[in-house]
C-alpha cells in the first residue's frame, strides 16, 4: 500500500545504523503490493513478497498470518528476526548487545513507551469475549507492536500463538481493541523479555527523549487526514470510549449488587 513511501529512507538508515558494526548479514523481508522496491535489483538481501492491500483493520489483524507465510524461509535462513513498523527510521547506531535478547529474557523483545503509572490505565483489551482479554489488575507492562523480535524459533512461536488467538476471534466475529497489538500483549503477559525503551522507537512528534536512536515517522505529515479515512479513527475512537464507559457501568453495577 501507500506505506511503501517509507521504504527507501528506512532501508538507507538501517544499512547505516542498525548492526552495521557486526558480522551479521541483514536480510530484508518486505511485504507489499507494488511491483518493485528501492534497491531490490542491487541488494540480493532484499526479498519482496506480494501482499495485497487489505482494508483496515484486516491488514493489522492478519499481520501474524502474513508473516507466517515465510515461516520456512525464516527458520532456514535466519538466526534472529526483527520486525519494524513500515514508518520506522534509524537515527543513530544500534549495536548487538542493545538489541539482542538473552536466555533469561526468553530470546524475545518488544517496545514499551512506559507512559502509564497504573496498570489499570493500560489499554489492554478488556472484552471477555476476545482471546486478547486481560483483566484489570493484571500485567506490569504495556507493549507497543511497532518493534518486536527475537531468536527465530521463539519469534515464530510468538507469531503462531498470536495468529491462533486472532483466528479464534475472527471466527467469533470479535475484534481486539488494538488489533495485533492487543494479541501481542496477551501473549507477552507475565513473560520476562527484553524491553526496549522509547529511545528505540519514539514517535516523531514527541519531544522526549531528545536524541532517540530510532523514530516512528509522523504519518500525518505524509498522508494528512487521509490516514484517518484509512483507519476510520474518529468513529472508532468514539465507539471504543462508549464501550469502555458501558463496561465500567456494568462492572460498577455488579459490585453494587
Identify what each model region corresponds to.
Residues 41-54, 64, 98-109, 211-215:
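Active-site regions of enzymes building and remodeling cell-envelope glycoconjugates
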Residues 131-220:
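Catalytic core and acceptor-binding pocket of nucleotide-sugar-dependent glycosyltransferases
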